[in-house]
Amino acid sequence: LNINIFPLDKHSYTFPNPLYSDDQGLVAFGGDLNPNRVMIAYTNGIFPWYNEDDPILWWSPNPRYIIELDEFKVSKSLRKTINSNKFEIKFDRNFVQVMNECKKIREDKEGTWIHEEVIETYTKIHEMGFAHSFEAYYEGELVGGGYGINIGDIFCGESMFAKQSDASKVALYHL
């Protein structure tokens, strides 16, 4: 059991090597959600994930789910939905609304890690040009989508929501 969890200094944006994370991927705690700190974290394979009113926790799980675009397979049913052009797909039109939809607590969940401080930080990162939303609209209404951070050739998806079946999947496909 690895228990090397490092405290972060609010005045330094230095992160420990993710190889020092615990068995669940927790690598550090503390610091703040300054957009520059968050971007440095992402470039080091680390991201914040914590409940409101708890200390900020910084994670780097191994293994991590990765979608290799050249190996991405679309199911027949999803392909049918994509080809139907049922949804209008847009990007970065309603970033904050997408985050707020992702924030809504699902019936089978106790809470959400997406709270106002997270929304404020990711909105600033969006304004910096690194956070993006992908959106599916049906008859002019936002019905699915998600958001994440883009660094070089890597997109780190953070959360998705769907008010209609396959809406977020179709938007993700077009990403």
PLM segments and residue spans:
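N-acyltransferase acceptor-side catalytic subdomain
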Residues: 1-175
